[in-house]
């Protein structure tokens, strides 16, 4: 099913010597047997000349995630890292030795901690490169990222600790570097090229410490991870949310689903030689529902552009959330 609308928008002629034509399309398709799962493409085609200011092109981007990507990729801005500091009493080597035993502090791309809740808890992290020469590829735009041109992978370690009257107390850490894959089968969003298979994240974008209270006893930790793809004349960027809970002395993953995608591709040239830019976006929101299954609240991924949704239910056998009607 295809819905399409076109509108023409004129701008101040003192700033632009052309008109932008915005075309919006929504396409919906059922995914497997999940009747309410749909895949959405929202495309905006901007016909501009070289005199178009970056702010006008950026104005076509609807979501904050896309504007941040545009600022980094097109405007060269280095946005602040998330949590790049340590509380008093926690030395970088102390945190690194706990999170990543045997890894050298000389290979640290970043290290930090962020308060979690109000019980003196912190989520600490360390991003470690393979060789010292790899540090030159760390540009500060992510907590921990893979350099796309060099295909250089960095390892991201993380764990929860407590400061008790200034004394460091290790509570739970992820077993090794972050390697939980993401799959687009039930995401409502456009996928990466290999999105039909499990894809390990290329970068860590943000520590998301919103109160994800998945049960009456457990609050999950959120980590936003990222992926990127390059194409002739453009690129694509994707973000996913991963949730982790404390299980003994380990942090274990219980949810890993796509939340956003942004594509900026070169379009066709018109009869005047103007080349279009095609910007595709899609975004999910995660909702915690009031109903429970096996002691855990149901989760819902809702597409903010077309309202489609997929519900997830706790599986005791799998030890994680699964699509409620995943086929």
Placement of each model-derived feature along the sequence:
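Acidic/hydrophobic-patterned starts of short beta strands in beta-sheet-rich repeat architectures
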Residues: 117-128, 213-227, 288, 292-300
């Amino acid at each position: 099913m295809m819905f399409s609308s076109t509108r023409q928008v004129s701008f101040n002629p003192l700033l632009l010597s052309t008109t932008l034509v915005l075309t919006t399309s929504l396409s919906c398709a059922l995914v497997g047997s999940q009747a309410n799962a749909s895949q959405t493409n929202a495309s905006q085609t901007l016909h501009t000349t070289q005199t178009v200011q970056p702010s006008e092109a950026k104005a076509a981007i609807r979501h904050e995630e896309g504007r941040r990507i545009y600022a980094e990729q097109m405007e060269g801005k280095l946005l602040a890292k998330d949590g790049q500091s340590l509380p008093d009493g926690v030395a970088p080597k102390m945190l690194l030795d706990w999170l990543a035993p045997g890894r050298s502090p000389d290979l640290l791309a970043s290290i930090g901690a962020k308060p979690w809740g109000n019980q003196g808890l912190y989520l600490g992290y360390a991003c470690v490169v393979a060789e010292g020469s790899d540090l030159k590829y760390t540009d500060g735009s992510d907590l921990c990222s893979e350099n796309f041109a060099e295909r250089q992978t960095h390892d991201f370690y993380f764990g929860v600790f407590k400061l008790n009257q200034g004394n460091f107390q290790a509570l739970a850490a992820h077993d090794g570097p972050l390697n939980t894959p993401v799959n687009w089968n039930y995401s409502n969003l456009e996928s990466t090229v290999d999105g039909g298979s499990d894809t390990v994240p290329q970068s860590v974008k943000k520590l998301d410490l919103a109160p994800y209270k998945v049960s009456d006893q457990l609050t999950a930790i959120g980590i936003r991870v990222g992926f990127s793809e390059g194409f002739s004349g453009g690129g694509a960027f994707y973000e996913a949310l991963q949730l982790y809970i404390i299980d003994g002395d380990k942090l274990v993953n219980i949810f890993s689903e796509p939340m956003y995608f942004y594509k900026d591709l070169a379009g066709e040239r018109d009869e005047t030689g103007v080349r279009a830019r095609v910007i595709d976006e899609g975004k999910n929101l995660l909702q915690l529902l009031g109903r429970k299954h096996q002691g855990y609240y149901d989760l819902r991924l809702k597409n903010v552009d077309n309202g489609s949704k997929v519900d997830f239910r706790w599986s005791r056998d799998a030890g994680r959330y699964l699509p409620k009607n995943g086929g």
